[in-house]
Structure formats: structure tokens, C-alpha cells
Amino acid sequence: MFVMTGYAQCTLENHEKFEKGNRHNIGLFTLDNDHQKNIDQIKKFIKSLGWDSIEFYFTEEIHDKTTIKHETVRQGMKRAYKNGQSLIVDDTPIYLH
């Protein structure tokens, strides 16, 4: 399991949690060992969920899922094990200067 962290801009209209145009931290969980080669496919997946201007700044391999204690992260990993990949988004917008 790999987690790619970065940020993306919301493109969703009238979403209850996210305002269009705001940027948020994201975590993309994937089982794809070639995730760096398949970055276009990964970004297409994220765009299909209503996010754009996607930038990744860190990738980490998770060797032992039992060490993950944060429930949102655990749920994201669970969905990735089921579906091959999963996206989590931080509710709080970020502002880049």
C-alpha cells in the first residue's frame, strides 16, 4: 500500500463540505506498485471525484497497516484494499502564498 500526499483544488458545485476553488490536502491510497508511472491515470481518478490542479509532494509505502491509528486514514486504506485506490480529503482548506 502506498499513500501519495499532496493538494488539489475543489471543482464541485454546491458541496456540503467543500467550496469550489478552495485547495485541500489530499491523500491518495493505491495498491499500484507503478504509481509513479501511472500518475496520469491517478490524476484522472481524482479529477473524476471533483478535484483539479493536483500536486503530489510526498509518497510513502505503508508496510504495516496495524501501525495506522487515525480512523479516516484507516478507512481510506480499507477502501483502497477493496477498490485498488482511494482518496481522502482534509476538510480544512489550505492557502498557498
Task: Name every feature range the model reports, one short phrase each.
Residues 1-31, 36, 40-56, 60, ...:
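Long, contiguous binding/interaction regions
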